[in-house]
């Protein structure tokens, strides 16, 4: 098993502990919902910092709720781009080398 390729999501309450124990990476998932980058950031940031203690590598999961980077509406695309730029800034802050971004494609709409 190549531990370098395994990342546990912080959605799981014990992900940090297990990642430290087995040498896995951590996927920061607290910002999947964009409001955690805004009004809740002061509360969420120290939690993320604590989870990353003793973790050598991480990925950052960008927000995806109600974001459509492939939208027909250019204002919707602009919002997605703004959120993704902010996610990339946060990823750098936390030392993450990769960012997970969903395309926003919905077959029921397009």
Across the structure, where does each feature detected by a protein language model lie?
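Active-site acidic/histidine proton-transfer and metal-coordination neighborhood
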Residues: 70-110
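Short, low-complexity, polar/charged sequence segments that are solvent-exposed and flexible
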Residues: 25-30, 45-48, 77-81
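Acidic (Asp/Glu)-rich catalytic clusters
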Residues: 15-23, 40-60, 85-95
